[in-house]
Amino acid sequence: MNYIGAHVSSSGGLEKTVLRAIQIKATAFSFFTKNQRQWFSPPLIQKKIDQFKAMCIKYSFQPQQILPHSSYLINLGHPIDELLRKSRKSFIDEMIRCSQLGLIFLNFHPGSHLNKITENACLLRVSDSINIALEKTQNVIAVIENTAGQGTNIGYCFEHLSEIIKNIDDKSRVGVCIDTCHLFASGYDLRTKKDCENTFEKFNSLIGLKYLKGIHLNDSKKKINSRVDRHESLGLGEIGTAAFTWIIKNENFSNIPIILETANPMIWEEEIDWLRSQKKL
């Protein structure tokens, strides 16, 4: 079955994320385990952990349906050693928070070279950062998100993701989340069924579908290969609806969280209903 949902707010308590997911008829969701604009937050208290777990049980959310997202401040490929250490410490803290909540994924953007080191050096720093985090934590899978290639961000091509994974010691604890807006903005076509087939054949060849742990389903305000990350509601952007229908009907993407981060949260429930209707066609 498809797990479909959206990135919901954790305002008011982590347990509220489950209720917000239910309100839009979601069977998957994403959220920040802490303030995404801060490096560190107070440790989770046991009461909040228990409340979150109880809500997940009450509404039948399993760990594989939930794809928490890390802080945007973290840059696991940072060229400056002091800020690289800070990023690594923050990332490990978020991995621990996920483990405490009984979750198995942490989705993150790989990082940026900031024009201070080469892309290859940055990719190696990301791999080293993940290895350090995996050594210091248990159970949680580090899920690398592809990027649009905006600015000096790495991770905008399958070769980058493959290179990061190649240098991970425990490959059972690394995965990939594909964001369709980022994919399109970085030059991978998705506008027709054939385009989708070609793009994901490349993904399977260079990385492997076994590493795909989640999908961020977003249309794009900007044209293909724009290298600009601007999400749009499904069918209202440059990608169009064919890609989303193809993805939702593809059995390779069953049993992984498919998360909306589209432009208008007010129509998330409508978008989820539409996706489910496409599955039935």
Curated annotation (Swiss-Prot):
UniProt-recorded Gene Ontology molecular function terms: deoxyribonuclease IV (phage-T4-induced) activity; DNA binding; DNA-(apurinic or apyrimidinic site) endonuclease activity; phosphoric diester hydrolase activity; zinc ion binding
Cofactor(s) this protein requires: Zn(2+)
UniProt entry tagged with the keyword Repeat: no
Stored CDD domains: AP2Ec
InterPro entries in alphabetical order: AP_endonuc_2, AP_endonuc_F2_Zn_BS, Xyl_isomerase-like_sf, Xyl_isomerase-like_TIM-brl
GO terms (BP aspect): base-excision repair
Keywords, sorted A to Z: DNA damage, DNA repair, Endonuclease, Hydrolase, Metal-binding, Nuclease, Zinc
PROSITE patterns for the chain: AP_NUCLEASE_F2_1, AP_NUCLEASE_F2_2, AP_NUCLEASE_F2_3, AP_NUCLEASE_F2_4
Keyword Nuclease among record annotations: yes
Entry binding sites for Zn(2+) 2: E145, D179, H216, E261
HAMAP family: Nfo
Record's function text: Endonuclease IV plays a role in DNA repair. It cleaves phosphodiester bonds at apurinic or apyrimidinic (AP) sites, generating a 3'-hydroxyl group and a 5'-terminal sugar phosphate.
The protein's name in its UniProt record: Probable endonuclease 4
Protein's gene: nfo
